[in-house]
């Protein structure tokens, strides 16, 4: 039984995309860091690693049996037993998982650099239980509310959060916005297209706006997002979460 001890975790809950499980250098002071007193280490194949990182589906039953009640959370002076908690690695990537008693990877965390090094050293020194995904890897359906990794590649944690917020606002615009509203925001994004937009239908204008904002992140993206969230209390709250210095 290969165990890791005193492992710091920063749980990201309900994340179906691995890019939202932030690496250590993106952890924030306001994040809630917990310590796993002991946690089981598993070696997995690349396909199962993809499955764990980028899905919220049931984990293999044999894996769950292997880790059942083997891990403990340290809280104050006590140890709390966790039903299904483990660290998985494919030899390149590492992720900690806690199912919160379910069969799906509800909570996910990266490790600190030092603990990542310990994981890699352990792989070479000890016989770590190995698991493979025995079913075909489910196709991933990316959309506005779950953008592809390529659309967020190279962005910081704050930029990723704001980019996803912008896409959420655009999703609402597509659903509830009038033709005039879509043209307005397309013009805000690219003022030079104003005259051409007057001759285009709703679908063309929408596609032009979406194709424009999908690539990368820039000051233009930032200004558009800032303008579009105004007047929408839910979106404004999400905006404020990324700007704590502005909230009095």
UniProtKB/Swiss-Prot annotation:
Pfam families membership: DUF3603 (PF12227)
Listed InterPro entries: UPF0736
Protein family according to the UniProt entry: Belongs to the UPF0736 family.
Protein's name in the database: UPF0736 protein ABC2536
Organism encoding this protein: Shouchella clausii (strain KSM-K16) (Alkalihalobacillus clausii)
């Amino acid at each position: 039984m290969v165990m890791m001890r005193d492992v710091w975790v920063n749980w990201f809950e309900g994340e179906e995309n691995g890019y939202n499980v932030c690496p250590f250098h993106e952890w924030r002071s306001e994040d809630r860091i917990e310590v796993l007193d002991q946690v089981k280490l598993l070696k997995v194949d690349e396909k199962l690693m993809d499955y764990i990182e980028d899905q919220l589906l049931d984990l293999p039953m044999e894996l769950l049996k292997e880790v059942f009640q083997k891990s403990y959370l340290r809280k104050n002076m006590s140890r709390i037993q966790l039903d299904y908690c483990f660290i998985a690695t494919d030899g390149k990537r590492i992720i900690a998982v806690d199912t919160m008693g379910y069969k799906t990877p509800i909570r996910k965390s990266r490790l600190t650099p030092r603990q990542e090094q310990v994981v890699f050293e352990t792989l070479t020194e000890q016989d770590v239980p190995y698991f493979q995904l025995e079913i075909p890897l489910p196709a991933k359906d990316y959309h506005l509310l779950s953008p592809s990794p390529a659309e967020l590649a190279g962005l910081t944690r704050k930029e990723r959060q704001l980019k996803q917020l912008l896409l959420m606002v655009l999703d609402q615009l597509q659903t509830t916005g009038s033709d005039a509203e879509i043209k307005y925001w397309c013009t805000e994004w690219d003022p030079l297209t104003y005259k051409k937009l007057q001759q285009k239908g709703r679908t063309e204008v929408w596609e032009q706006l979406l194709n424009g904002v999908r690539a990368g992140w820039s000051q233009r993206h930032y200004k558009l997002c800032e303008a579009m969230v105004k007047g929408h209390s839910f979106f404004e709250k999400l905006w404020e979460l990324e700007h704590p210095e502005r909230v009095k």
